[in-house]
Amino acid sequence: MKKLAVVAVGLMISGLVGTAQNKLKPLISSTNFTTKAQLWESIGSGILNYQADVMYIYGKLYVTPLMPDSANHKLPTLTDAYLYPLYNQFKKNNGEIVPGYPDDVYLILNLNSSAVQIYKQLALEMRPFAEMLSFKIDGNEQKGKLRILIKDKLQLEKINSVKPGFLGLVGNMSDVDKNVDSSVMPLIEVDFNEITSWKGTGNIPFEDFTKIKNLVTKVHVQSKKISIINCPSYKTIADLVQTSKIDFVTTPEATRMAGFFEIAK
């Protein structure tokens, strides 16, 4: 029975991933995955970018925003839930996480304990998967397929003050006019409520749509991508994303939102 289950999972993965590049969704899933199967299913649904809470606990990185109550916890490790399944796809597809997808996959980490300690452990845990990473350090660039980012500028400064590392930064609205190098800050994240008071019902006011279009253009001119957060999970939002050329919606309801996007032609 166990062998049959393994075969079934393998067939599901190969079938779903084989068609994923034809239906990629402009989404970043902010749900903390607990198993590698969740990530594979996400890829099969066309959701390729992820955000996860990470904590250093007794020599390993775990996917959690909070310290567990017991040493006998069942929390997933970052390697099991994200790094290994992504690398599995990378190797199986000859250096591509999804065949034909030209861009980096983003893994955004929220660091919930000492940033330097987490980074040192992450560097150790990434060693078997190092060829998959995209980064630029002191002028040396590696073009892999996975870009690991964090949001906290002070955390990144602390990490890089010890030794320049492979992490990139997610910017925010205040960074749009700073023109930070896209190799350092490839993604700008904007709170939906900062750019419109529209709640996703009816039509978005034209002046708000124009403002959003101009913002997207300004970000794209810098060779960066833009994601919106804290927006309703409605089809009207999917329509706005497609018409305004927003790159991503970051949401804990990525599976629901995926159903609102048409299959890419």
Predicted regions mapped to residue ranges:
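Bacterial Sec-dependent N-terminal signal peptides
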Residues: M1-K23
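Phosphate-group recognition and catalysis centered on beta-loop-alpha active-site segments
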Residues: A20-K265
